[in-house]
Amino acid sequence: MVKQASAWVESPLQMLCAVEAHHAGLLGPATEVVPRAGLRALRVTRRELRALTLPGGLELAAPRERMPSRVRAVGDAFSGKVQMRWLTSNPGRIVIVDDGLATIRLLELLAAGPYRPLLRARARPGRLRRALGLAAALRLRLSKVTVFTALPVTDELAAAVRRAGVDLVRHDFAWLRAQPISTQVPAERTVVLGTSLVRNGLVHRDQYLRWLTDLAAREPVAYYPHRREDPVDLALIRERPGITVHDEGVPAELTLRGLDPGQRVLSLPSTAITSLRVLLSPRGVAVEPVDVPEDWWTSRAAPALRSHLSSHLTGVTG
């Protein structure tokens, strides 16, 4: 009987990348992808993925409240629950899939040495949480770790990660690119990806809404919300003339891969820029990053964080 590997996923992107990791052969011949229960976006993404031809040996399990006792693949390496599972189960081999810009921070911490606690960029941990992050970092040093990513990684960082004993495997959504396109695309020429920067208190709401309003005054806009956008903000966006909000709840990589030549995607700093370029550039669709003007940032956005976000795109201002 073939032993089944488990992948624990907590976001739509993690779920998609777990499928890609299985397709790439990183998880063995049989994989069960287990979504965390209670998240509508995961339920919708699971439904959309099951409508496609999944790789052989892969099962998209029903959502569960609890993480499996042993997990081969995860997305959120900074999760306290994930780190506790690593410490209590001795996983041996770990595959970490993309989880947005947090993946880049993880690579930077792994490259910096074994005594850097695995903590989120804006975390203010207490002593116990810092100790858990440090213990998790040391556990990874004793395990075989693979980071599976579609994000751009500099040669310098990639070399440092590999010197630290971590395998870095790049991918270009090979499984998804091979799937037939059946989703209906928006009629609008311009598609805007929503952002979590406003809800996270990093970008001023008024400035962001003014930009959307000005953009929609020039042409109709299709707006695809970020899964963590504030419902109050979305209600305000829906009120703007010329903006159609498509509340899909699935990764942009799935929803927008069928855009037509001549359409374009605009986005504030987001890892979706990289993945959508992989999927859409061959179709003649422009994916245009939008630089965040200085007066958009709030005082909570420290200069280092602004640089970290902006360094992942070289763009135009809408």
Go through each PLM region and give its residues:
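Leloir-type glycosyltransferase catalytic cores
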Residues: 299-318
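A nucleotide-sugar donor-handling region in carbohydrate enzymes
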Residues: 111-194
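Histidine-anchored nucleotide/phosphate-binding helix
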Residues: 12-27, 87, 204-216, 272-278
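Short loop/turn segments at strand-loop or loop-helix junctions that form parts
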Residues: 76-77, 94-101, 188-197, 291-292
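Active-site and donor-binding regions of nucleotide-sugar-utilizing enzymes
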Residues: 6-119
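Redox- and metal-dependent alpha/beta enzyme cores, enriched for Fe-S-associated oxidoreductases
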Residues: 179-182, 190-246
